[in-house]
A protein has these predicted regions:
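N-terminal signal peptide c-region/cleavage motif recognized by signal peptidases
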Residues: 15-17
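Bacterial N-terminal signal peptides that target proteins for export
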Residues: 1-7
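N-terminal module-boundary/linker segments of secreted carbohydrate-active enzymes
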Residues: 21-64
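Domain-level detector of nuclease and nuclease-like folds
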Residues: 68-237
Length: 237
């Protein structure tokens, strides 16, 4: 009842859903070249059957609040660009609790590939990481096909009024319900909300089946409990 009541209270705060989350983005002429991203002892190569996928999106104002001083965050956080939700990545999940990763070695992404997707995932190094760790485990996918797929899934998402939600008491379940209202076919149990230790919104993880359709998230995937409080950072820092 508590989650239902919270969702009902939030319904009045959800106007027509917004789509584009790169409010302002200009790709620079000089794009930093990423370094190789390879398997390590702590992050080993793991080839496993794919049971589904996770589409992870990051709340950029919160990211910039915590990580804006990092050298690799300048494009996203420290210039005239402005973002809402950005695309973290498309992650193959395993059939159980483990997932495939770093399935094969790969070279540095071409500049044109990075430039084409920098306004969705505003970090050349993160793009390199996502392809190396996750994309290489998707059979038959090239970097261009992998990013085209992840950007298509990201691009179809619609969003509630995050500014309005940030000004009212909010739970993870309430945010999930608001996100579901903005996206026909998406239910609250098809996503997970993550936050930092202070309760500031970090990411939303959307659960997909092997056909890239929304599905109920497995219980082991983690995220906040539906009644956990969530705060939304509005400013960059």
């Amino acid at each position: 009842m508590r989650i239902t009541a919270a969702a009902a209270a939030l319904a009045t705060l959800i106007p027509a859903a917004a789509s584009a989350q790169a409010y302002q983005c200009r790709v620079p002429g000089a794009i930093p070249r990423p370094h190789p991203d390879l398997a390590t002892a702590d992050q080993p190569r793991r080839v496993l059957p794919i049971g589904g996928y996770t589409l992870a999106i990051t709340w950029s104002p919160g990211y910039c609040r915590d990580h804006g001083d990092r050298p690799g965050s300048q494009f996203q956080c420290a210039n005239d660009n402005a973002f809402g939700f950005t695309l973290h990545g498309l992650w193959p999940d395993g059939i159980g609790k483990d997932w495939p990763q770093y399935c094969k070695s790969t070279g540095i992404l071409p500049r044109r590939t990075i430039a084409a997707h920098l306004c969705a995932t505003p970090s050349p190094q993160l793009l390199q990481h996502e392809w190396a760790k996750h994309g290489t485990c998707m059979a038959g996918f090239t970097p261009d096909r992998y990013f085209a797929r992840s950007n298509a899934l990201y691009g179809r998402l619609r969003y509630p009024d995050m500014d309005a939600l940030s000004r009212a008491p909010l739970t993870a379940g309430g945010l999930s319900q608001a996100m579901a209202r903005a996206n026909p076919g998406l239910r609250a149990d098809m996503m997970r909300i993550t936050a930092d230790k202070q309760g500031w919104l970090d990411e939303i993880w959307l659960c997909l089946d092997r056909r890239f359709q929304y599905q109920r998230c497995p219980a082991h995937q983690g995220g906040l409990a539906p009644d956990a409080g969530v705060r939304i950072w509005r400013g960059r820092r």
